[in-house]
């Protein structure tokens, strides 16, 4: 049954388009741990219930949110903190967008 299936680090990496080394790094930093670590082989295994958390971490990284902030979000799981984190990042991205638009306008002016 799929709900009880264990996924190796390689399978998890491939399914989520993420490097195995990134999963190891997230584990090392306390951001995303495997469900099971075999004590004899030290192989990491993940379960299907971890998929949504990994997708959330990937989304937050795509927004350029620092790992320190992502770890705090995961540790706290506080809706108010999550909302604040996203609002803050949105403002930073809008500021960056305005800077890019300004630079493009200057470039366009110099071209013509």
Map each language-model feature to its residues.
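Basic helix-turn-helix/winged-helix DNA-binding cores
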Residues: 1-63
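Short, charged amphipathic alpha-helical surface segments
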Residues: 58, 70-112
């Amino acid at each position: 049954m799929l709900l009880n299936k264990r996924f190796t680090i390689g399978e998890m990496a491939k399914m989520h388009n993420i490097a195995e080394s990134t999963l190891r790094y997230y584990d090392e930093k306390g951001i995303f741990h495997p469900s099971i670590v075999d004590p004899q082989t030290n192989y990491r295994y993940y379960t299907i219930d971890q998929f949504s958390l990994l997708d959330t971490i990937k989304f937050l990284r795509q927004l350029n949110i620092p790992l320190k902030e992502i770890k705090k979000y995961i540790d706290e799981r506080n809706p108010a903190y999550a909302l604040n984190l996203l609002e803050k990042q949105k403002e930073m991205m809008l500021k960056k967008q305005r800077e890019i638009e300004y630079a493009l306008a200057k470039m366009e002016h110099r071209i013509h």
